[in-house]
C-alpha cells in the first residue's frame, strides 16, 4: 500500500483567509505574547528585541532555551498534536492541550505548569501593540482555537522561514535571525546597512517608545509575513526601509502583484499571489530581493561589501 507523504506545493502553501480564523488568530496572538514575555523576562536583553522572539520549528514555534538561574527550560507550541510543552534541562516535561480556552485559562495553566516545575516566572501582564489591551489573567473574551487553521498558519510560517533563511544567507552584513515577533505578530528578517538611523518617532500602541527606538536605531531593510488585519485584510508579505530613502515608494519591484501601501509605508505582496503562483518560491524570493535592492540602491548602501558575491 502506498504511503501518502505531505509536501506538495498545494499542501505547503495552504489557503489562509483571515476571515475564516480571525478569532483563533487573535487568541493565538495573545498566547504567543504570554510565552514571548516569559522569554523576555528571563533572558539577557539583546539589541532590537532579539532576545524576545520565537522561532519556527518542525512542529510549531519555540522560545529556544531560556535561563532561570542555573536552570534552563524551553516552551514550544506544537501545531501538529496541538499541545503546549515546557521542557526543562533536567528532563521534566509539563504539557497541556491547545484547544478552545480563554487567554486567562491559558495563563493559569502555564503558571500552574511553572509551579510544578519549580520555576518562578513574572511577566508584564498586559499585551503589547494591541488596542484596548485586557490583562492576560482577566481575558475571558479571546477563547477560540481552530486546530486546522492554527496548523495552516504554522505551515505558511514553515515556508516563509525556509525562504527567508535562503534570502538571509545572501548577505554578509549585520542581519537578524529569521524570527517570530509576537507583538504584531509577524515572521521577519532584517538587514542592516551599518549606519545609524534618525531617532524613530515611536507612537506604536501600547509599546514604549524606547523599545521602538532601540529596534530602529540603525538603518534597515526589513521583510516579513503577517496573517493580516487592519489596512491589509488578508495575509501578506511585506518589505520596508527605515528610514525610507527618497523614491522608495515609487521603486519598481517584483512580482507584478506587489504594490506600495501609502497607509503602511511599505511594499505588500498578497500571500495568495505567492500561494497560487506557478513558482511560489521564485515569486517570493523576487519580492524579497527587489525590495531590498530598492532600499539599498536608493539609500546608498555599500552593497559591494555587504552583499554576498554570486558564484
Please state what every model-predicted region is.
Residues 82-95, 128-148, 235-238, 263-272:
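Glycine-rich, often proline-containing surface loops adjacent to acidic residues and nearby aromatics
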Residues 55-133:
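Long, hydrophobic/aromatic-enriched structural stretches that serve as scaffold segments
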Residues 2, 26, 259-311:
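TerminUS-proximal long segments
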Residues 65-67, 249-254, 279-283:
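Short conserved micro-motifs at the rims of enzyme active sites and ligand-binding pockets
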Residues 213, 218-268:
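Low-complexity, glycine/alanine/valine/leucine- and proline-rich hydrophobic stretches
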Residues 1-86, 93:
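An N-terminus-focused feature that recognizes amino-terminal "leader" regions
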Residues 138-226:
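Aromatic/basic-lined ligand-recognition segments
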Residues 16-19, 23, 94-102, 141-155, ...:
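Conserved aromatic-histidine-acidic binding/catalytic patches
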Amino acid at each position: 500500500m502506498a504511503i501518502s507523504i505531505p509536501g506538495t506545493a498545494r499542501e505547503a502553501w495552504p489557503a489562509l483567509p483571515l476571515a475564516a480564523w480571525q478569532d483563533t488568530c487573535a487568541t493565538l496572538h495573545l498566547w504567543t505574547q504570554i510565552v514571548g514575555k516569559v522569554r523576555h523576562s528571563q533572558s539577557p536583553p539583546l539589541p532590537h528585541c532579539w532576545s524576545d522572539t520565537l522561532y519556527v520549528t518542525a512542529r510549531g514555534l519555540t522560545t529556544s532555551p531560556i535561563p532561570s538561574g542555573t536552570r534552563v527550560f524551553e516552551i514550544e507550541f506544537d501545531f501538529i498534536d496541538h499541545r503546549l510543552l515546557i521542557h526543562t534541562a533536567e528532563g521534566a516535561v509539563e504539557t497541556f492541550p491547545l484547544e478552545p480556552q480563554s487567554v486567562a485559562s491559558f495563563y493559569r495553566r502555564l503558571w500552574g505548569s511553572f509551579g510544578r516545575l519549580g520555576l518562578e516566572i513574572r511577566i508584564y501582564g498586559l499585551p503589547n501593540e494591541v488596542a484596548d489591551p485586557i490583562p492576560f489573567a482577566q481575558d475571558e473574551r479571546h477563547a477560540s482555537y481552530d486546530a486546522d487553521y492554527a496548523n495552516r498558519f504554522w505551515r505558511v510560517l514553515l515556508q516563509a522561514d525556509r525562504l527567508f533563511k535562503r534570502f538571509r544567507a545572501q548577505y554578509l552584513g549585520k542581519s537578524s535571525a529569521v524570527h517570530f515577533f509576537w507583538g504584531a505578530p509577524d515572521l521577519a528578517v532584517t538587514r542592516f546597512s551599518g549606519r545609524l538611523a534618525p531617532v524613530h518617532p515611536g507612537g506604536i500602541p501600547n509599546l514604549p517608545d524606547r523599545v521602538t527606538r532601540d529596534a530602529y536605531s540603525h538603518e534597515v531593510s526589513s521583510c516579513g509575513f503577517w496573517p493580516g488585519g487592519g489596512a491589509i485584510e488578508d495575509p501578506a508579505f511585506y518589505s520596508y526601509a527605515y528610514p525610507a530613502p527618497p523614491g522608495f515608494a515609487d521603486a519598481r519591484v517584483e512580482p507584478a502583484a506587489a504594490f506600495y501601501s501609502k497607509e503602511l509605508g511599505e511594499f505588500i505582496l498578497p500571500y495568495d499571489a505567492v500561494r497560487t503562483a506557478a513558482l511560489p518560491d521564485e515569486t517570493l524570493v523576487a519580492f524579497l530581493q527587489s525590495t531590498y535592492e530598492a532600499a539599498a540602491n536608493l539609500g546608498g548602501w555599500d552593497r559591494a561589501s555587504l552583499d554576498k558575491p554570486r558564484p
